[in-house]
Swiss-Prot record:
Species classification: Bacteria, Bacillati, Bacillota, Bacilli, Lactobacillales
Keywords: Cytoplasm, DNA replication, DNA-directed DNA polymerase, Exonuclease, Hydrolase, Nuclease, Nucleotidyltransferase, Transferase
Enzyme class name: transferase
Designated name of the protein: DNA polymerase III PolC-type
GO biological process entries: DNA-templated DNA replication
Major location category of this protein: cytoplasm
Pfam families xref list: DNA_pol3_a_NI, DNA_pol3_a_NII, DNA_pol3_alpha, DNA_pol3_finger, HHH_6, PHP, RNase_T
EC number: 2.7.7.7
GO terms assigned for molecular function: 3'-5' exonuclease activity; DNA binding; DNA-directed DNA polymerase activity
Name of the encoding gene: polC
Subcellular location field: Cytoplasm
Family according to the record: Belongs to the DNA polymerase type-C family. PolC subfamily.
Species per Swiss-Prot/TrEMBL record: Streptococcus mutans serotype c (strain ATCC 700610 / UA159)
Stored CDD domains: DEDDh, PHP_PolIIIA_POLC, polC_OBF
NCBIfam families: dnaq, polC_Gram_pos, PRK00448.1
Amino acid sequence: MSELFKKLMDQIEMPLEMKNSRVFSSADIVEVKVYPESRIWDFRFSFETILPIDFYQELRSRLVTSFETADIKAVFDIEVENAEFSNELLQAYYQEAFKQPTCNSASFKSSFSHLTVSYTDGKVLISAPQFVNNDHFRKNHLPNLEKQFEAFGFGKLSFDIVSNQKMTEEIKHHFESSRQQQIQKASQETLEIQKSLEASIPPEEIPKPVSNFKERIKDRQAAFEKAEITPMAEIETEENRITFEGLVFDVERKTTRTGRHIINFKMTDYTSSFPMQKWAKDDEELKKYDMISKGAWLRVRGNIENNPFTKALTMNVQNVKTIVHKERKDLMPQGEKRVEFHAHTNMSTMDALPTVEQLVAKAAQFGHPAVAITDHGNVQSFPHGYHAGKKNGIKVLFGLEANLVEDRVPIVYNEVDMDMNEATYVVFDVETTGLSAINNDLIQIAASKMHKGNIVEQFDEFIDPGHPLSQFTTDLTGITDQHVKGAKPISQVLQEFQSFCQDTVLVAHNATFDVGFMNANYERHDLPKITQPVIDTLEFARNLYPEYKRHGLGPLTKRFQVSLEHHHMANYDAEATGRLLFIFLKEAKEKHGVNNLLDLNTKIVDDNSYKKARVKHATIYVLNQKGLKNLFKLVSLSNVTYFAGVARIPRTILDQYRDGLLLGTACSDGEVFDTVLSKGVEDAVEVAKYYDFIEVMPPALYEPLLARELIKDEAGIQQIIKDLIEVGRRLDKPVLATGDVHYLEPEDEIYREIIVRSLGQGAMINRPIGRGENAQPAPLPKAHFRTTNEMLDEFAFLGEDLARDIVIKNPNEMVERFEDVEVVKTDLYTPFIENSEEKVAEMTYEKAFEIYGNPLPDIIDLRIEKELTSILGNGFAVIYLASQMLVNRSNERGYLVGSRGSVGSSFVATMIGITEVNPMPPHYICPNPDCKHSEFITDGSVGSGYDLPDKICSECGTPYKKDGQDIPFETFLGFDGDKVPDIDLNFSGDDQPSAHLDVRDIFGEEYAFRAGTVGTVADRTAYGFVKGYERDYGKFYRDAEVDRLAQGSAGVKRTTGQHPGGIVVIPNYMDVYDFTPVQYPADDLTAEWQTTHFNFHDIDENVLKLDVLGHDDPTMIRKLQDLSGIDPKTIPADDPEVMKLFSGTEVLGVTEEEIGTPTGMLGIPEFGTNFVRGMVDETHPTTFAELLQLSGLSHGTDVWLGNAQDLIKQGIATLSTVIGCRDDIMVYLMHAGLEPKMAFTIMERVRKGAWLKISEEERNGYISAMRENNVPDWYIESCGKIKYMFPKAHAAAYVLMALRVAYFKVHHPIYYYCAYFSIRAKAFELKTMSAGLDAVKARMADISQKRKINQASNVEIDLFTTLEIVNEMLERGFKFGQLDLYRSDATEFIIDGDTLIPPFVALEGLGENVAKQIVKARNEGEFLSKTELRKRGGLSSTLVEKMSDMGILGSMPEDNQLSLFDDFF
């Protein structure tokens, strides 16, 4: 027994007979770890053998009890020399294990503590009943049991569970027997009560039935109110009468076929999450449980059972009640509350959680007068923060946490005029116990003195730091306690090193670190700091070799083949650095003409050195409107000009735009904090002069620095904070306590953990500490939004007065410096095109006169006047003119342009050529230029002008043209005509890039930007992150907890992007920084376009956004026009043969059985999907108006299903009379007699799904007005079901395009099929497609069968759609040819009589570039062999073999073969 252990035995008063026993004869205390803050002493004991169980229990009891008297928690584990044991000892310790915290789970303890264990074949087996022998217990509890036994001294044991059938049967028998006894007992008690009651009733009285139901309910409710709350994490098996309290985060209500209701919901108590199920027998009972809603805090009680469908433990809820959740509150009185100056939102990429709305609302809830936004490197939360501040009545301070870098990082410091070839260099390296020159120690200084490339002298000394080295230091440097033991005093080593370095140039790799450490130690020992020249080989390498990705000592020595045997030992590092130095000097002389030390910083350091410069954080705040614009410029420059891995702001650029901005020192990654940590207060004062205020953060936020051994302990953190405050005092700069907020509540920490860890070890924050399999990243800091009270508690070590100054007084005084700024403008700023108003008006009337004559019909004249008054009066003319110019340019290139949205509601847009849709009431118009007579049908009896019967002009006898879709202008620009027009245009996908460039050409490159988007973590992605975290960090979550964690982790910014067609146009009398910063999409510096930094929706009411979209329809129309020579504008919209497609297949010459569908809708845009084909089958439309209805019904939400479909089936309404498109509501109600304003308002309420959200009073007013005008009840009820409606103008444009395509399908089928396969088909299988009808039908049947069992791939689903068209084409008598090596085109199908020849891209796996290369190569000469085809055509061996198998290559040989006789022929 060691003296130390003997002393401990005396102190805890161990019984004498035990203390003197042989058991403790070789006992020793191996290690004691003391944790003063948490008051824990952790002992590690050593014994010869495993302790008898009574010895262990006595030791544990006395040790714990003795230390408890001093308010210290004592814990221990044991190591033994001989770990032999009997099964009896094993069983005794097994039962002891369940008294330990590691094995104290309620379910594990209750199920396993009474079982028997045995040791067999190197494994401990637990004999258990069948129902607990499962993977859950194996995965979650046996590892804890194994760890506990290791702590007992048993070493590493492996545990497993084996089923004991006898035990299983006995438990079942016991359960049944016990249950039967309970039933019999209950029956007997009931019988005795009944007899007792009968005996007590007088004979003449009729006994009344006894009912104690209400009492039982009351008793149960009382029990529910008083029930003990069980943490969800403790439930691991089926249990009865469990009570939870928690937050509802997901709710789904279902109704069974029998009318019963199921409420499936999920709750969390933040220990875990649980699925719940509550049944309600009818609607009345269901209403009782309205409190079960997302965000509600509930107490629930029920039985935990395995759900047979989800296979998950689920609570069948019996009781439920709402509870009051105790939220954190800021308890300080108003006027004495803090202001958070450092807070991140979910726009901090993959780093923070709250939306800016949540952040601002939380600050307002706390009663804080203001809150700052400081996202990492971006300001994308500004617009929403601006609106949130106004909504919550709180001042929002707009800022960001910038990545500050030096523009030109020097290679040499303290440079002097010196011939580098003649200089003597001391190349040195230091090894330390950490990165802080203030908190860590030097343990080795080594140097090589070199002249003309030769080592002339060396220096190498270890230094004893006066304390044991940590394992981390030893692992990193290879230096052990033995190396430093007995070393010279540090003062002597420093003096000797200074002498060694006299009259030399110092050299180090990452010299700022080494020199900083040396200067701090020189100063500490009253020695002069370094003043001689210092060359940093790290910056030397970065500037000489900017193309290298890594410039660390290790990668450089490998690249230049310099020996480095023991990296991170100073002597080896110094010698390797010296060898590299002379390689660099030679390179600098030969390539840059560098001979003098002064030349290093002037001839080699270039303007791109910022890309490799070390990033330091700084917080930048907007003080006024000028500051806002300057910040927008800085953000733009950092993302566009100075982006390198992250958005960087060079210091000189910040200086250039600093007016109106306020600078803070940021977090532990700021340069002031770093200087205090690494060099001390004196140096930090110089650095801090650049800033306006000093930030200090709660000690908890600096705790990761402890894990990284940058700071020794909690006292060290407190000292750093005091030093930062001292820096502020010396410079008379305010010190503000900030919270570096990344989430709102402490329990949200896990969400950030999941998001951050998903970045992998490549992210700096996830770099493992130490080496080996067990190396883990530093813990993330506690970064929730702290109240004033919590913040004062964090800084209590400073004293009350100072704590209040930095937490309350200074931040509130700082807020007074901030002026109100306008982040989002209130007005629309359209670009300027000279004479745009006159041009729009002129073009409108010119076209109107051309069509309708001069003077115009009153209905036309009034409509134009009404629209132009709105368009010109609100400054919208330039939007119309720009759209017209874009459409006209595309038309000139031979493409039609389709309109989207409601622009077709504007007759002016029709007249100037933006849209083909005519919104006037249905009408006839005479095309005779000498007549131009017109007739309008204004009573609503005709839905579309295309449906008017053919008619001869009553004035001149010319056949009338027909037009007009009856769409009110109000649906485009609002009832008052002042809504910003959103003109969406569908350009051909082939022409879209040209149309985009047209925008630049019209407005100027500096005024046209792609509309920016922000991509956030999607729900499915978040789910993947949670599962990855679970896997990587050894967690196990039940499914409900995974769902909760995924829900909490979703929505965080992940990347940026661009709208597929949206282009934002800045007015040419302003600049983009008046509205938004700019950037490249997804930080792609090679992108052709810059985008708005803000999501374009945030500024869409301030600047013009043109939607220049790409679409297949215009491309298809152009292809058909090229093939046929037919002008698509001449195709009639009422062709009777085309309309037959919607009612049968006869017009195609095929039967329903042959093509598998009752109509001819396959491949027709808008009508070819399964959903719309089903609608067509049910309704059989015969008019253009009915097709518009179908288009509206198919695009709306809750317009067809459960609404119009039922009305048509029940015969209540027809396809023509149901509500189809949004505009029809307004038109119908006006025809019914409602005032236009009310008709418009009702339409707006219905189309946005707000009918049931408005007040009952408002809704009843509309209903009364409709009923007064005889609007049927079914129509009113239909309005109430709608969630979203399609614009009629959009439907009209789409249907018109669809009918043009359908025209070719009916009248020019081979052209149609050629265009369809060239443009619309997404998947091909040429072997099947060219093999004939039987092969095609067989493949379709195969895919259909797979789809029924959800086994068809996405490619097969797309292929099925293609094969439907192939099948139809073949049934109509056309042929699908084989791919032809010498005739097939690269990308387009070719017509050969009645046969289509496929292009090379139709071959699976062959891309467009290879297809074009094949065509190019064959034009240069015939392919003589497969080898030649591979080489010249750029084909893979796999593709060549596939072509060979399909017979495409004929008898082509493998290789070119030459014969002796070749030359004779």
